Amino acid sequence: MPRLSKLIEKLEDRLSGKWGRWYARHKAKLPVYIPLGLGAWYLYGMFVNSLRLGKQSVFNTTGEVIESIWVFNPFKNLIAPFTPFGLGVTAVIALLICLITKKGYSWLSGYKFVRDKRGFDILPDGTHGTSGFMDKKERARILETGPVDQLAGTVLGKYKDDPEDDDKYAEYVTLKKGSGLTEHTMVYGATGAGKSRGFVKPFILQCAKRARLGLQGAKDSLGQVCQPESLILVDPKGEFYESMSGFLRDEGFEVRLFNLLDMENSDAWNCLADATEDPNLVQSIAEVIINNTSNSEERQDFWSKAELNLLVALIHYVIRLKGPDGKLLPIHERSLGAIYRLLSSESFQSLEEIMNSLPKDHPAKAPYGIFKLANRQIWGNIAIGLGNRLAVFQNPLVDKITAYNEIDMTLPGRKPCAYFCAISDQDSSLEFLSSLFFSQLFSRLMNYARREGDGGRLPVTVNVCLEEFCNIGKLIDFKKTLSVCRSRGIHCQLIVQSISQLSDRYEKKEWEELIGNCDIQICLGCNDQMTAEYISDKCGSVTIRVNNNQFPLMPLFSPVYGTTRP
C-alpha cells in the first residue's frame, strides 16, 4: 500500500502541473480575468442577498421593515454565496443547469458523450463506429510518457493535455516495452515535413541511449536487462554521418560509412566476399542487380533471364578464382568490377574456352549451360546487355569501394555498430549497390541469428532505419524479410514520402503487406490524395449526434392552393 507522503507528493505534482499549465495559457489575460471574476462574485452575492431579502419581505413575520432588497455593501455581497442560503441557491441553479443542458443530462442519466472541439458530439453507441483518440488508461497500457531523459524507447511524438499548453508541459511518447506491438515503424512525410529532424535524429539519440544502458547492464521498465543495440542508417545527404558519427564513436559504436555520394570518402564493401563464405548468396546478388537495372516490363522477359544466368555463372567463376599457388586470389581481385572487366576485355570465344575448361562439378557450369540454350547468334547481345548493366564499374572509384572489404555484415549483430549508407537522391545508376548492401545485410544477419544466436535471436538488437526507403532500390522479397526479421532481433523503420511513391516501387499490393507489418505508423504530413485517403480510412469512423430541423417553406403573401386530379 502506498505511503501517505507519496500520495500527497503525487497530488501536489498533479495540482502543480495543472495549475502551471493553466497559468501559462492565461498569464497574459490575468489582469482582465481577475477584475471580471471579482465583479462577477460581487454581482452574484448581490443577487443572493436580493433573493434573501425579497423572501423576507414577502414572508415577513417579525414585523421588520425592509426598505430595499438591493445590498451594495461589498463585504456582505462577497460573503453571501457562502452562507447556507447562498449555498442552497447555488445548488438549485446547478440542478436547473443539469436539467436544461445536454452536459447536465449526461451527468444525471449516465449517457456520456464527448463534445469534440470541432463542434459535434461523439456518442458512445458505436452504431457507425467507435474510433477515437486514446484515453489515459489506453495510453498507460501501450505507451510510456514523460521527460525524454527518462524514456529509452523510440520517440513517437509529444503529448499535451491542451494544444495551447506551453511546450515545457509536453510529455514525450514512446512505445511501452511488452505492449505486444512490433517496433517496425512506417513514417510518411512529404518533402520538408521534418522526417530527418523530427524522427531520424531523435531515433539515433535514443538508440545510443539504449546501447549505453545495454553495455551498463541496466534494467528496463519490465525489470529485464537491457540488450545492446546497433544502428544501420540510410543517409541520403551524408548529413547524419557528418553530425552524429563522432557522438556515436564516443558512445562505443563501431562506425562505418558506405558512401555512394562521395566515394573517395567511403569504406569499401565487396558483396562477393560474403558470397565466398555463403555461396547461397550468389543467386540473390544476381537477382538484385538484374531487377534494379530493369523496368517492370523487362524483369520477366527473355533477355533479363538470359543475362541473369550468365551473371550467376560469372559470379561463381570469379569468387573461386585461384592464383598459380592454388590459393584463392585476394578479395580485391574477385569483385563485380572483375566481372565487368572480364566481359569488356575478353572476347566471347575466350569466355567460352574459360567455361569449358572448368571441372564438371564447378557451380558455374550449370547456369552457363542454361545460358547456352539460347541461340548462339544472340550470345554476344546477351553479354552486351549484361555489360551495360555493370557499366558503373567503369568508374575507378566505384570499382575501388566494391573491391576491398572493410565492412563486416554480421558485426552489428555481435557488438554495437553504426553503419551509414550514403546514397544520391539524384543519380539512380548506383541504386543496385545500395539495394545489394541492405539485401545482404538482412540475409547475413538473419542467417547468423539462426545459426549462432540464442533462441534464433541476435546477441545485439539491430535497428535498420531506411530513410528515403524508395530511393535505395528495390529489396527482393522484402515483405517476407520484414515479417520474420523481428523474431531475429532486427527492427525496421521505413521512411517514405507518400504511399503513392511506395506503391510505385513495390507493386501488386506488396506495398500493403509492408505497411501491414508495421504496427506503428506516423504521418508527418502529406500532399497526395492517396496517402490522405489511406490515413483517413485507417483512422476509422465514429458515431456522432446529428440534429435535423424540418419545416415547410410557404410563401408569405401568396396563398397556397392544393389541387388534385380527378
Give, region by region, the residue ranges found by the protein language model:
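Short beta->alpha connector loops at strand-helix junctions that form conserved
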Residues: 259, 496, 525-526
